[in-house]
């Protein structure tokens, strides 16, 4: 197959499920020369009011199968670094319990994988940043301000992961943090979550990243007594690495993406986006 020009250049993906959004980004890399997209802007809708994240099982299963074969972390494990969905289920809707469970368990998470987790985890940075109001629990601060009064400035609904004091280091490679920042935009139609990455590993981490961000957004929407409307992820450089694009083991995953990522009408999603943009502009 003749390759299209180099994949460096902006790519916008707008889909009603995270599997298809991730699949389209991967197919763009596969079908173009080079292993990177810069920048990648990925937007997902289709979220249900009960917090269920829309996925295409064929793509998710094919990816998890390949990750397992390559001895890499599963989608669920990567997502857990951003939002501990299992603990939220145990907490049964009590966010104070969720934060307490995570704080108590965090030393064990670090001990289970000291090489990758020695610098921290994303949810840990969001809830125990080390300084700031609410003992560094940025999510609790956002929610307490949202609940406490009307007319709160919109710039208040943001949380940082990157910390110059800890993360400006001269290491040749740094696994954490790639996610820099998240922000939340309540609208009349629902909550929009935005996430910003300097770099992102498309094969190894991106799908799990998107799932974790969506779960975080669904949690925040639940606590704001609304629903998750849209997830936007902005990536400076999305890289397809640690696996060659010519690896035969990729073929089942590529086939699943091609079978499920064909263009489909999305009038409803377009209407939602227009309405959300109008609300944000207002």
Stretches found by the model and what they are:
Residues 1-282:
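Terminal, non-catalytic protein-protein interaction segments that mediate quaternary/complex assembly
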């Amino acid at each position: 197959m003749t390759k299209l020009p180099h994949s460096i250049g902006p790519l916008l993906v707008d889909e009603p499920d995270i599997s298809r959004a991730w699949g389209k980004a991967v197919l763009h890399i596969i079908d173009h020369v080079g292993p990177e997209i810069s920048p990648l802007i990925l937007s997902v809708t289709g979220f249900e009011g009960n917090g269920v994240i829309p996925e295409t099982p064929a793509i998710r299963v094919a990816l998890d199968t390949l990750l397992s074969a390559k001895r890499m972390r599963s989608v669920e494990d990567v997502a857990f670094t951003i939002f501990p969905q299992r603990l939220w289920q145990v907490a049964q809707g009590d966010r104070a319990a969720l934060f307490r469970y995570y704080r108590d368990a965090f030393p064990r998470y670090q001990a289970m994988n000291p090489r990758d987790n020695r610098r921290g985890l994303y949810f840990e940075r969001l809830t125990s940043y080390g300084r700031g109001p609410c003992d560094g629990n940025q999510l609790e601060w956002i929610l307490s301000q949202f609940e406490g009064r009307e007319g709160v400035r919109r710039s208040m609904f943001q949380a940082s992961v990157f910390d110059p004091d800890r993360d400006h280091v001269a290491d040749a490679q740094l696994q954490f943090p790639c996610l820099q920042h998240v922000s939340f935009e309540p609208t009349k139609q629902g909550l929009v979550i935005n996430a910003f990455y300097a770099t992102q590993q498309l094969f190894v981490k991106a799908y799990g990243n998107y799932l974790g961000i969506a779960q975080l957004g669904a949690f925040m929407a639940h606590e704001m007594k609304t629903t998750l409307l849209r997830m936007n992820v902005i990536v400076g450089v999305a890289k397809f690495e640690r696996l060659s694009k010519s690896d035969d083991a990729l073929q089942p995953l590529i086939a699943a993406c091609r079978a499920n990522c064909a263009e489909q009408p999305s009038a409803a999603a377009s209407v939602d986006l227009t309405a959300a943009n109008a609300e944000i502009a207002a």
